[in-house]
């Protein structure tokens, strides 16, 4: 079931890592500039980082960056997140109106998924988990805040059905795209993607401490892997 990680550009590792780091730096810098210049609401700048940072998995996949590099990078990013909680060095990473360790969990989830699935030769499942979190959760938050009219509560956290539906749709589309790329577009792919989407929305509904930034990517990646192994492999 593995996918060959061929580097089409045959770049040395240090250049590949440098390109990925440059991309992440550009994402954070853009968000910081928007935040410091007050050109966009604080929550929007956070979601720019949230969505933008997740795309690094595609760069790592395309450039065949080894899993161990991703694991180390995840630990390094987690360290920066912890430091940013102590010192206001990157306000664009801070949660708005709530105490959260979401950035820390997000960095750890990327490190775990890239380190694990890339090392197994299964980068597609790392991509699914990370991009479900990036696009699903990121868009759900923005849609819920802007257009959320129908509210409900889960363990004291207010959610909107509009945001939850966005999470389901984005997660479904991400999973369908990547599974279809690998296994072809089939009914089973739709079933697996639907399972991932519903489970991801359920995991996202419990977001105390920002733990959904860990449970959503790990859960969606593992469900996609298990479903593919059982029904598509």
Curated annotation (Swiss-Prot):
It is a multi-pass membrane protein. The keyword Membrane applies. Disulfide bonds: none annotated. Keywords: Cell membrane, Kinase, Membrane, Nucleotide-binding, Transferase, Transmembrane, Transmembrane helix. Its EC number is 2.7.1.182. The chain crosses the membrane at residues 9-29, 56-76, 96-118, 122-144, 172-192, 213-233. It is found in: Cell membrane. Pathway: Cofactor biosynthesis; tocopherol biosynthesis. One of its GO terms (molecular function) is nucleotide binding. One of its GO terms (cellular component) is plasma membrane. One of its GO terms (biological process) is vitamin E biosynthetic process. Disruption phenotype: Cells lacking this gene show a reduction in tocopherol levels by 50% or more, and an accumulation of free phytol. When measuring the kinetics of chlorophyll labeling after adding 13C, the mutant cells show a similar rate of chlorophyll synthesis and degradation as the wild type, but show a reduced rate of accumulation of chlorophyll containing labeled porphyrin/unlabeled phytyl (13Por12Phy). Coiled coil: none annotated. It catalyses: phytol + CTP = phytyl phosphate + CDP + H(+). InterPro entries: Dgk1-like. Belongs to the polyprenol kinase family. Catalyzes the CTP-dependent phosphorylation of phytol to phytylmonophosphate (PMP). Can also use UTP as an alternative phosphate donor, but not ATP or GTP. Is involved in tocopherol biosynthesis, via the utilization of phytol generated by chlorophyll degradation. Also plays a significant but not critical role in the recycling of phytol for the biosynthesis of new chlorophyll molecules. This is Phytol kinase. It comes from Synechocystis sp. (strain ATCC 27184 / PCC 6803 / Kazusa). The lineage of its organism: Bacteria, Bacillati, Cyanobacteriota, Cyanophyceae, Synechococcales.
